[in-house]
Amino acid sequence: MSDEEQTAIVCDNGSGMVKSGFSGDDAPRHLFPSIVGPPKNEQAMMGSAKQEMFVGDEAQAKRGVLALKYPIEHGIVTNWDDMEKVWHHTFYNELRVNPESHNVLLTEAPMNPKQNREKMTQIMFETFGVPAMYVGIQAVLSLYSSGRTTGIVLDAGDGVTHTVPIYEGYSLPHAIRRVDMAGRDLTEYLMKILMETGMTFTTSAQKEIVRNIKEQLCYVALDFDEEMTNSAKSVSEEPFELPDGNVMQVGNQRFRCPQALFKPALIGLDEAPGFHEMTFQSINKCDIDVRRDLYGNIVLSGGTTMFKNLPERLGKEISNLAPSSIKPKVVAPPERKYSVWIGGSILSSLTTFQSMWITKSEYDESGPSIVHSKCF
């Protein structure tokens, strides 16, 4: 591939946000919510606003009159027509490029169904006419972005959480843990426990308000029971201004919400392991010789790891589970909200990577299943 070839596009399609930009950049250029919305009823939209479907920020802004839908649930694309609209919006409206002249690197959650990545591959070549593409596993890209090739990544986004042990650049699939509990579940849990304040949040528009409350006010308690006791003794509330100008007070919900990450039973997932247990279980499924290296490189990734105190609490909980001779080290890169994208940008700009792209001619020869032999 000559140097004159157009820069590759890197697109990290999360359940909650699309992060897109160009290979070699140090941050994504465009971020928008992974949502599409047709109007709830045709009459509600007048004149120039009358279009079939809104995507991303525009859908967010008009959420009152739209029926918002997420095409990606728990990291898996559930509606391909809507997903195509999201990609079209990414290429033509956000990045303002013609995908026919750019290689495209996409990301996916580990343990995704095989047909999911085949369908992605097919759409890229057949609908968008890309010259070449690649599908990278999100957690592996995050580890690259932290400058490591060995470690265990705890990646928690909006739709899915997984712990992925990686040794010298290769993920260890037998030891991956995946739980369908992440940011969106916390938002729903917060909606539920905020009802105690007398407020009700039911519409998709109100759900976005609760997501903002979660991101701005919630934090992880280092010691949950102690925090509960203290909050019962003295009322500690934080104000939050609602879009209509009213102010609501948020109390112990601020730390009760993220507690579900360590105790999923709070949100009805009785069998699911918490963040600390997932990490511990993944490490224990690995060869005994690599465990110490993994304990020493527990790398956080994704927006749901951004809560205040989460790295400290995770380290404390894993210490309680691990052998006494082990001192776990939790690494929380400040840019971890975008580390999957950053890893994709780094990987796709390496000269050694250029032979890894799936080209159009390889696709024509082998069909969508080529993705399993070239992307692993």
Swiss-Prot record:
Keywords: ATP-binding, Cytoplasm, Cytoskeleton, Hydrolase, Nucleotide-binding. Gene3D superfamilies: 3.30.420.40, Actin, Chain A, domain 4. Its EC number is 3.6.4.-. Disulfide bonds: none annotated. It catalyses: ATP + H2O = ADP + phosphate + H(+). Actins are highly conserved proteins that are involved in various types of cell motility and are ubiquitously expressed in all eukaryotic cells. This is Actin B. It comes from Trypanosoma brucei brucei.
